[in-house]
Design a protein with these regions (language model features):
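Active-site proximal beta-strand in glycosyltransferases
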Residues: 2-7, 115-132, 162-163, 180-186
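A short, histidine- and acid-enriched strand-loop-helix "catalytic/donor-clamping" loop
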Residues: 12-15, 71-76, 124-139
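Conserved donor-binding/catalytic core segment of Leloir-type glycosyltransferases
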Residues: 4, 200-216
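Short N-terminal targeting/anchoring amphipathic segment
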Residues: 88-107, 119-122
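N-terminal subdomain of nucleotide-sugar transferases
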Residues: 1-53, 61-64
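Donor nucleotide-sugar binding/catalytic pocket of nucleotide-sugar-dependent glycosyltransferases
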Residues: 141-207
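Short, well-ordered alpha-helical microsegments
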Residues: 49, 106-110, 170-171
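Nucleotide-sugar donor phosphate/pyrophosphate-binding loop at the beta->alpha transition
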Residues: 20-24, 79-84, 131-153, 194
Length: 216
């Protein structure tokens, strides 16, 4: 079985291999190998001439490959969406299972492609597209939020298999159809924390951090 994983994540291509700046790891990709032997990631990519391997996860190896797809997260892509869908259908036709991580434009395009090809489509609901766009800060994002929200609701409603990363919030905003198989489980992978780290005394400094990608 050949699996296609679809998302807007921007990978870096360095010396023929693909790397993630942190959001996606090889461990996540290997978790899908119970569904099939080979996994192909379809997403955006940038070619770079240097890379700090300590800050990036290599995601390509003998069972995980990469397929670059055009940027679908700009105004131009809305006009060319039919062309992007045709391209997605051509790619998706070579695979047995489509995994679409939403919200993402590439994920939604390939979810549509999978339905047109009558392929099994598993949708991962990892965030609310309305919140992502409406509170992003730009007028264009606010105007696009209702369309993206309705589209994502429809895709989830039509899906036979849905994985939510929340216990109830996303389930209420993006309900499934009757009879759909659903899973509620976080997609976070935690590293082992030693007792010495747990027992560190708190200092008076306050650190504020942001979890997420700043380059999407």
């Amino acid at each position: 079985m050949k699996i296609l994983f679809c998302h807007d994540h921007i990978f870096k291509e360095y010396e023929g291999e693909y790397y993630s700046p942190g959001k996606i790891s090889i461990e996540q990709m290997e978790s899908y190998q119970s569904l099939g032997d080979n996994i192909t990631i379809v997403a955006r990519s940038n070619k770079v001439t240097s890379l700090d391997s300590s800050k990036h996860n290599q995601i390509t190896h003998n069972r995980v490959s990469f397929c670059a797809f055009p940027n679908a997260s700009n105004f131009k892509s809305l006009i060319l969406r039919k062309e992007l869908l045709k391209k997605a259908i051509k790619i998706a036709s070579q695979y047995d299972i489509i995994i679409a991580r939403l919200p993402s434009e590439i994920g939604s395009i390939f979810a549509q492609a999978g339905r047109k090809l009558n392929k099994p489509v598993l949708i991962e609901v990892v965030a609310c597209v309305w919140d992502n766009l409406y509170y992003f800060g730009t007028i264009k994002a606010k105007l696009y939020a209702p369309l993206a929200y309705v589209r994502m609701r429809n895709l989830v409603k039509q899906a036979d298999f849905v994985h939510y990363v929340t216990s109830s919030f996303l389930q209420k905003r993006y309900p499934t159809k009757k009879g759909a198989l659903t899973l509620s489980a976080s997609d976070v992978i935690l590293s082992t924390v030693s007792n010495s780290q747990r027992n560190l005394k708190k200092n008076n400094e306050i650190s504020i951090g942001v979890v997420g990608s700043m380059d999407n």
